[in-house]
């Protein structure tokens, strides 16, 4: 391995790289970041420089908001914390780096919950705001993952569980006026789909800014919304896990009852919002007609763990990896590319076509839930290539050129960079007690330039400092300065938190052949893309081999 790359990582000062701090609380944020041990270095290209620029801008997105504790803000022109994004998927990613900020962000929504159970759709300097619902990523999933990553604090879990239970009741009471079991959209902003043709001829906000009311003079409202319904389905599945963990055994807090409610939501989703011919989820309007706009609703529903792997693979072939649909050069578009209503312009807040960074950070869970690891990297490479030339960290990208679009210092794009680097070539802790060491490097799809060349990454886990080096000759894992594993590039090594080898995963479209050097043994293997090989007693054995779903063009 390159000694110079090791020296570069080990001598790297995060403090020096991010420069002068501006806010009083930034000093504490830097201290917490350094406690995570996370550092990233690259042998060439601009990605290392952009990485620390992103970290510096991340601190700008953290400030007291509606209370005394610093919480995550959306950033850019969005001065506040939104439940659909900042308070869920953004905070879920941030939890691996600055857990105290994520926890404060989650708790701020519980703190500001209305007496009737409604959670604010956003929190600003002026306090909580309730005029719409605005749901996408299930809050319960984000909370559950934070709980698993950081000490399993049952006091935190109970506070959030009770708040989310009350919110579930509010949605069932006020957002099922048609009695279908679906969750209804009363306005565009209920789903955060600004300017999407999905909501043409629908008001931006609920009637008179009352989240429990819709315009009864509308010829098409309310919509039975697949993304809102899928959110509640997934939410209820995670609430069942929480109820079981908290020992709740009766009444509304019974985990069996939560699973029954989740099943009802799933049944309603498929009965009312799924079109079998198109194999797609659509809103159903008040006249019982499908709103046939193919949008990123699909990715949202998939990220809510709806359907089995075969179902998801069909979605990949027909839509998510289809270059006529959502698999643009810089994926994923917010409207299908072959829809005549598709509008690629990214210079303003739009869900009418451009690739939004919120879609990019929601995507990994949808893919990884079904072990589609290789296919996910095909989104990582172009997006990191675009971010490699980032100057502003925008909300949107032009899906054809990757040029930066609307706004700047936007926390989803900042967190996208941190997350994609860790998933592609870093060390990622999982709430189930696994560590992922991924032996890939960013690949520049633009003009043949180099983004990073060889990479180095480190992270502190339970008092041990782990390092991962990805070079042209292969990959190396160190613990507390000592090499514990070497292996060929193109695989992901899965260990426990103590560094004990559990399995490897093929991360390339090509078969990877070579040997793992571990505990004094040279262990030969050949692993296909997405194949998982378990390790036991000095040997690898196949756990699963699901093959690869390839891009489609028609």
Q: Where do the protein language model's features map onto the residues?
A:
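The feature captures the catalytic groove of carbohydrate-active enzymes
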Residues: 1-22, 121-138, 169-256, 290-292, ...
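Low-complexity, Ser/Thr/Pro/Gly-enriched N-terminal "stalk/linker" regions
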Residues: 1-80, 104, 205, 268, ...
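Long, well-ordered core segments of solenoidal/helical folds
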Residues: 4, 9, 54-66, 97-120, ...
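Active-site acid/base region of carbohydrate-active enzymes
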Residues: 37, 41-53, 96, 114, ...
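Structural helix-adjacent loops and short alpha-helical linkers that scaffold large soluble proteins
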Residues: 39-48, 94-106, 147-165, 178-179, ...
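Catalytic cores of carbohydrate-active enzymes
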Residues: 45-50, 172-187, 224, 231-311, ...
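Aromatic-rich carbohydrate-recognition surfaces in CAZymes
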Residues: 79-106, 111-196, 229, 353-367, ...
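C-terminal capping/lid segments that line or modulate ligand- or cofactor-binding pockets
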Residues: 81, 132-135, 139-149, 280-319, ...
């Amino acid at each position: 391995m390159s000694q110079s790359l090791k020296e570069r990582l080990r001598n790297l000062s995060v403090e020096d790289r991010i420069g002068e701090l501006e806010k009083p609380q930034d000093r504490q944020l830097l201290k917490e970041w350094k406690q995570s041990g996370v550092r990233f270095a690259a042998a060439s290209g601009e990605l290392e420089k952009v990485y620390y620029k992103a970290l510096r801008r991340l601190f700008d997105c953290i400030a007291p908001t509606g209370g005394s504790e610093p919480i995550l803000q959306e950033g850019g022109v969005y001065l506040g914390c939104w439940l659909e994004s900042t308070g869920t998927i953004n905070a879920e990613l941030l939890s691996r780096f600055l857990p105290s900020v994520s926890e404060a962000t989650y708790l701020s929504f519980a703190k500001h919950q209305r007496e009737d159970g409604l959670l604010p759709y956003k929190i600003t300097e002026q306090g909580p705001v309730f005029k719409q619902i605005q749901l996408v990523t299930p809050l319960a999933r984000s909370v559950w993952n934070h709980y698993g990553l950081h000490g399993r604090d049952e006091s935190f879990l109970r506070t959030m569980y009770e708040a989310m239970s009350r919110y579930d009741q509010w949605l069932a009471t006020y957002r099922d006026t048609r009695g279908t079991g679906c969750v209804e959209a009363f306005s565009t902003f209920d789903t955060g789909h600004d300017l999407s043709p999905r909501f043409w001829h629908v008001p931006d906000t609920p009637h008179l800014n009352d989240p429990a009311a819709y315009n009864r003079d509308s010829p098409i409202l309310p919509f039975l919304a697949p993304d809102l319904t899928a959110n509640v389905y997934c939410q209820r599945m995670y609430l069942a896990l929480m109820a079981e963990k908290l020992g709740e055994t009766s009444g509304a807090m019974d985990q069996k009852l939560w699973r029954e409610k989740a099943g009802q939501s799933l049944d309603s989703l498929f009965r009312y919002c799924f079109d079998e011919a198109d194999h797609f989820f659509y809103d159903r309007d008040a006249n019982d007609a499908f709103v046939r706009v193919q949008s990123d609703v699909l990715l949202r529903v998939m990220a809510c763990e709806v359907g089995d792997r075969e179902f998801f693979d069909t979605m990949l072939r027909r839509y998510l990896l289809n270059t006529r649909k959502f698999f643009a050069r810089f994926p994923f578009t917010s409207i299908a590319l072959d829809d005549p209503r598709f509008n690629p312009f990214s210079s303003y807040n739009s869900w009418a076509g451009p690739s939004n960074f919120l879609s990019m950070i929601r995507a990994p869970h949808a893919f990884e839930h079904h072990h589609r690891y290789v296919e996910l990297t095909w989104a990582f490479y172009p997006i990191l290539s675009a971010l490699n030339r980032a100057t502003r960290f925008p909300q949107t990208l032009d899906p054809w050129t990757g040029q930066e679009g609307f706004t700047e210092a936007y926390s989803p794009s900042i967190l996208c960079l941190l997350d994609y680097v860790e998933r592609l070539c870093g060390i990622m802790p999982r709430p189930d007690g696994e560590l992922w060491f991924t032996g890939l490097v960013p690949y520049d799809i633009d003009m043949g330039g180099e983004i990073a060349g060889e990479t180095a990454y480190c992270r502190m886990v339970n008092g041990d400092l782990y390092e991962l080096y990805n070079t042209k000759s292969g990959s190396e894992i160190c613990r507390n300065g000592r090499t514990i594993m070497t292996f060929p590039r193109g695989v992901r090594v899965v260990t426990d938190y103590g560094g004990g080898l559990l399995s490897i995963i093929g991360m390339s479209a090509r078969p990877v052949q070579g040997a793992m050097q571990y505990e004094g043994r040279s262990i030969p293997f050949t692993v296909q893309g997405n194949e998982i090989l378990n390790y036991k007693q000095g040997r690898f054995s196949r756990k699963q081999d699901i093959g690869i779903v390839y891009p489609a063009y028609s």
